[in-house]
Amino acid sequence: MNEQNGVLRPINGRAVLGLDVDGVIADYAGGLRPYAASDFGVIADGLPEPDIYSIVDAWPFSDYAHYRRVHRAAVEAGLYRSLPLIPGAAEAIRELSTAGVHVRIVTHRLFIGGQHARVVSDTVAWLEKHRIPYMSL
């Protein structure tokens, strides 16, 4: 890689964008909200938009293990196939790709064991549904 005009570029001249999914192009909190609300016994609109990074602290999970249980159930129910798209995200990524940027999806979605095949296939389905170009996941 070399630097040209402040942009790191691989030898072949294409810029590489490491693109996270949740909270960047997909609304993870919006997608998890109905699952968490059901678990808490509240209406989904009763859960505020998280104003801190840790959703475990933003919503009334008893602890991290509680969050993991809700998250696991949501993933098994298809969370990653149905997350809301952040407005304008798909268009922006398509524009970057058209300009020659190599889009590489980087994500921490694989943090719970036993769900890897589901997480990867649902992530790919979501990216394709929204026509978000990428070269690797």
Placement of each model-derived feature along the sequence:
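Substrate-recognition element of Asp-dependent hydrolases with the DxDx(T/V) motif
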Residues: Y80-P84, A89-T123
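Short, basic/glycine-rich phosphate-binding loops at helix/coil junctions
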Residues: A58-E76, V101-R104
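Active-site neighborhood of HAD-like aspartate-dependent phosphohydrolases
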Residues: N2-H66
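Structural recognition of alpha->loop->beta junctions
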Residues: T123-L137
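A general structural motif
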Residues: N12-R14, G100, Y134
